[in-house]
């Protein structure tokens, strides 16, 4: 009863409104400061951010046991290592590299890829994208990428990471919601998306 009477008084409502307004304004200004700081960090990183195009790797006596390799990890049966070798999961060495002596291992495989750079198998897309002659294509893509897309690729450090990111299914591969433009070629590293198929 007393609380109801107190809340009906104009000065109490004014104080509650004033405190709410102060809280709202301070929260908004803090959020704006964070946004400005984040933009500044991205711009600073963009200006000096360069992709490392050649993977530094010492083959030594070709046993390849000395160094570690990163690989595409996610494949159920196939994997691609950072040197562009595609191999079956069973032919992966402990250091993460494909065993180049295994019959299933091949470098720079474009088996399931079309001329527009779209492939039906993710690992072949990454391997094909890692070919040294694909560097100009990827540089053109990075230079023409929309601002929001460039922010996504600022975390990419080298050619391998760029190919991993580029070959993942993107919105360019999708025709409508969960329908692919071309279900047989949904992993793309190229500039042009797959052709639209009739629904």
From Swiss-Prot:
It comes from the Eukaryota. The chain crosses the membrane at residues 12-29. Its main location: Golgi. It is a single-pass membrane protein. It is found in: Golgi apparatus membrane. GO terms for cellular component: Golgi membrane. Pfam families: SPRING1. GO terms for biological process: intestinal lipid absorption; positive regulation of SREBP signaling pathway. Glycans are attached at residue 61. Keywords: Glycoprotein, Golgi apparatus, Membrane, Transmembrane, Transmembrane helix. Residues 30-199 are lumenal. InterPro entries: SPRING1. Residues 1-11 are cytoplasmic. Belongs to the SPRING family. Positively regulates hepatic SREBP signaling pathway by modulating the proper localization of SCAP (SREBP cleavage-activating protein) to the endoplasmic reticulum, thereby controlling the level of functional SCAP. PANTHER family: SREBP REGULATING GENE PROTEIN (PTHR13481:SF0). This is SREBP regulating gene protein. The lineage of its organism: Eukaryota, Metazoa, Chordata, Craniata, Vertebrata. The gene is spring.
